[in-house]
Amino acid sequence: MTPQAFYQVLIEHGITLTDKQKKQFETYFRLLVEWNEKINLTAITDKEEVYLKHFYDSIAPILQGYIDNSPLSILDIGAGAGFPSIPMKILYPEIDITIIDSLNKRINFLNILANELELSGVHFFHGRAEDFGQDRVFRAKFDIVTARAVARMQVLAELTIPFLKVNGRLIALKAAAAEEELISAEKALKTLFSQVTVNKNYKLPNGDDRNITIVSKKKETPNKYPRKAGTPNKKPL
C-alpha cells in the first residue's frame, strides 16, 4: 500500500489527512526503520508493507467505527513500536494515549517518536501490565484498552480488563479468527465480569485475514486481578 493509496482509503472513510498528518506518518516510517537497526522493533521495514501492515492495520478500529475523535482515554498494552495507538493518535489528535511496555528501549523510542511527531496527550511507562493493573493511578481509569497481537484472550483479559472503567472496552486486534480462542476465554471473561460484544473477521486490502474482538467491562474487577507478573500466562483463568 503506497502512502497515496493509504490516504485514498481514508478519504473513502470520510477522513482527509492534513499535510501535517501526512508528514507525521512519513516521519514515523523513517524513525521506525532507523531505530529498527538499533533495537528490534519490527520485521516489516518495506515502506508499502509498513503503511499496510502497521499503519492501516492499526487504524482498523477507527475505520470500522469503534473509535471516534473525542477526548477518550486509551491505554495500549504491549504497543512495541507504538501500534496500534500512535497511528490512531495521528488520525484523531483528541484522544489521550497511554502506553505500557515491558522493554525500556522501546519506551525510549516512543519518547523520541512522540517528540519528533509533536504529539501531546501521550504518556509512556516502562513495566508489566500486571503491576500497573494493581496501581490505583491506572486501575479502572481508561475508556478503552487496545492490544495488537499481544496474547490469547484467556490471558489478555486479565492483563487488560482491570484498567477499564465500568462499560469501558477492550479492543483486541489479531491476525486470525478468534472463535476457538474466545471459547477458551469464557471462564476468564466471566470471572472478570466482562463479555464479548464484537467478534469480526475482515481482510486487509491485500487479502490478509484480520480479526477485531471487543470486550465490554460490566462490573468492577475483583481486587485479586491481575495476579502477580507472569502468573496470568502460566496459569490462565
From Swiss-Prot:
Q: Which residues bind S-adenosyl-L-methionine per the record?
A: G78, F83, A129, E130, R148
Highest rank taxon of the organism = Bacteria
**What Pfam families does this protein map onto?**
GidB
CDD domains (UniProt xref): AdoMet_MTases (cd02440)
Please state which protein family the record places this protein in.
Answer: Belongs to the methyltransferase superfamily. RNA methyltransferase RsmG family.
Q: What is the annotated localization of this protein?
A: Cytoplasm
Q: Which NCBIfam families match?
A: rsmG_gidB
Q: Which UniProt keywords apply?
A: Cytoplasm, Methyltransferase, rRNA processing, S-adenosyl-L-methionine, Transferase
Q: Which enzyme class?
A: transferase
Query: Mainly localized where?
Result: cytoplasm
Question: What gene codes for this chain?
Answer: rsmG
Record protein name field: Ribosomal RNA small subunit methyltransferase G
Q: Which SUPFAM superfamilies match?
A: S-adenosyl-L-methionine-dependent methyltransferases
Q: Where is this region: Disordered?
A: 216-237
Q: What does this protein do?
A: Specifically methylates the N7 position of a guanine in 16S rRNA.
Classification via InterPro entries: rRNA_ssu_MeTfrase_G (IPR003682), SAM-dependent_MTases_sf (IPR029063)
Gene Ontology terms for molecular function: rRNA (guanine-N7-)-methyltransferase activity
What are its E.C. numbers?
A: 2.1.1.-
GO terms for cellular component: cytosol
